[in-house]
């Protein structure tokens, strides 16, 4: 799986023998992001919640992956929700960019896929935003928790969904179920 890891080992082994090589050092240099991702992806795969699956469309590009969350409790039980994650070059100084690809009726996720999760914010007033000490594991566990304990109707991104829940919880549940049947199977 971690083919980038073997590339890093190979590149480290070539450092000494490259002094006379004609290729420039910058074309073979591995970014800090990619070095971090090798370690973080291994940690993530070892500590993945049972309701989550990670897929790397290209195993040589650990900075682009998809996450599937299949909640086993709560309003969203029975659905499969796809997220696309892109880790920018400036990682770990900035958070990954995450978008929900599955249309969903959720107070913290818009129907167009924007996500309200404090640890994905570069700047956060409450101190719970992104910090260089956070990892991909934190991001995945945070996204998973949006379907259970981090489901937040008091500080919504999708105000219409939050107000719907306040007005009529049963109708809210029915609409969530309808979205799951139409978009999240």
Swiss-Prot record:
UBC core domain span: 32-185
UniProt xrefs under PROSITE patterns: UBC_1, UBC_2
Alphabetical keyword list: Acetylation, ATP-binding, Nucleotide-binding, Transferase, Ubl conjugation pathway
Recorded metabolic or biological pathway in which this protein acts: Protein modification; protein neddylation
Keyword tRNA-binding: no
Residues modified to N-acetylmethionine: 1
Posttranslational mods: The acetylation of Met-1 increases affinity for DCUN1D3 by about 2 orders of magnitude and is crucial for NEDD8 transfer to cullins.
Pfam families registered for this protein in UniProt: UQ_con
Subunit: Interacts with UBA3 and RBX2. Interacts (N-terminally acetylated form) with (via DCUN1 domain) DCUN1D1, DCUN1D2, DCUN1D3, DCUN1D4 and DCUN1D5.
Entry function: Accepts the ubiquitin-like protein NEDD8 from the UBA3-NAE1 E1 complex and catalyzes its covalent attachment to other proteins. Together with the E3 ubiquitin ligase RNF7/RBX2, specifically neddylates cullin-5 (CUL5). Does not neddylate CUL1, CUL2, CUL3, CUL4A or CUL4B. Mediates neddylation of the CUL9-RBX1 complex.
Family assignment from sequence similarity: Belongs to the ubiquitin-conjugating enzyme family. UBE2F subfamily.
Protein name as annotated: NEDD8-conjugating enzyme UBE2F
Organism of this sequence: Rattus norvegicus (Rat)
